Design a protein with these regions (language model features):
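Non-ligating segments of multi-cofactor redox enzymes
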Residues: 1-257, 263-308
């Protein structure tokens, strides 16, 4: 049976920015490596972090799950990565896209950019673009590395190599600034990736988390579990007055009263803070809470009958 956490929900949503900052720091503990221009090579690299965080970031504490998956799939002896897939499925079942909203460094980076005071644009008319990330997951993360191989049977990590802006932000830029040899070796591929990063930065100022909505394969994978994950959104229909404030507050274009566990919901909690009746909260566990609500209603009815 799932449990609702109304008070905790309010607190988590209010301090989400601090939680994101802490998660980013934990994901990138080895900060002195930025000055050294070196990569962390410890045992932590054998474990994947939950969010999108480049393996080549000097400070990273672990491996990027998308990069690690491509490395295994694209190896000369092709094998499906059961460890990484199992790890991602576990996270998907436990948390769903809560990871996107609270634990992903690149998601937080986009949110910080969106705080820059300029005119903001809505993405409600661009909903078709949200399906692009599933194509990126299937084609660039799995199919191309697995089947487009060189003479020795190895495939490139296509997403990391040609599309991921996080690799440039956390990896190529800091490493090239600290290491003249790397700086001298930068070529057309870096220029291409850098232009993608600049585009994402510009779009993030205008749109809320555009990369997360349209292109992130990790978000696409976690989205597959949003409706069945243990961490979910709960709307108390008895408290809801249908004012629509939660839907207007949602920057992921989700109406939590209609689809509380929509694939685009990142559990950011903006709807929780916007609700004047405190009808929206986080819920963790199995079930939808209806049995517990029905039991409480029955108990109240029995008590009323006794009083009469």
């Amino acid at each position: 049976m799932g449990k609702k956490f109304s008070g905790v929900s309010q607190t988590m949503s209010r301090f989400r920015g601090w939680i994101q900052a802490g998660a980013t720091l934990l994901t990138n503990l080895h900060l002195p490596n930025f000055l050294k221009g070196e990569l962390y090579q410890g045992t932590g690299k054998t474990v994947c972090v939950p969010g999108l965080n480049c393996y080549s970031c000097p400070a990273t504490s672990g491996a990027c799950p998308i990069g690690a998956f491509q490395a295994v799939v694209g190896s000369s002896k092709f094998s499906f990565s059961y460890y990484i897939t199992g790890f991602l499925i576990l996270l998907g079942v436990l948390l769903g896209r809560f990871i996107c909203g609270f634990l992903c460094p690149f998601g937080w980076f986009q949110e910080l950019l969106h705080k820059i005071p300029t005119k903001k644009l809505s993405t409600k008319r661009l909903k078709l673009l949200t399906y692009l990330k599933y194509a990126v997951l299937l084609v660039m993360v799995f199919l191309l590395p697995a089947f487009l191989v060189n003479d020795v049977g190895m495939g490139d990590p296509f997403f990391c190599k040609y599309l991921c802006p996080q690799g440039v932000l956390e990896g190529a830029i800091p490493l090239s600034l600290a290491n003249s040899g790397i700086r001298a070796a930068l070529g057309k591929l870096f220029t291409w990736k850098f232009s993608i990063l600049l585009s994402v930065i510009a779009l993030s100022v205008l749109f809320y988390r555009p990369f997360c909505k349209w292109l992130c394969p990790l978000g696409a994978f976690y989205a597959l579990f949003n409706r069945v994950s243990l961490f979910q959104m709960k709307v108390d229909k008895n408290k809801c007055v249908s004012c629509g404030k939660c839907a207007r507050a949602c920057k992921m274009d989700v109406d939590v009263t209609k689809t509380p566990n929509h694939t685009e919901c990142i559990r950011c909690g903006m709807c929780i803070r916007a609700c004047p009746m405190k009808a929206v909260c986080f819920r963790y566990g199995f079930g939808d809470g209806k049995d517990k609500a029905k039991a409480a209603e029955t108990l109240q009815t029995n008590n009323n009958n006794r009083e009469e």
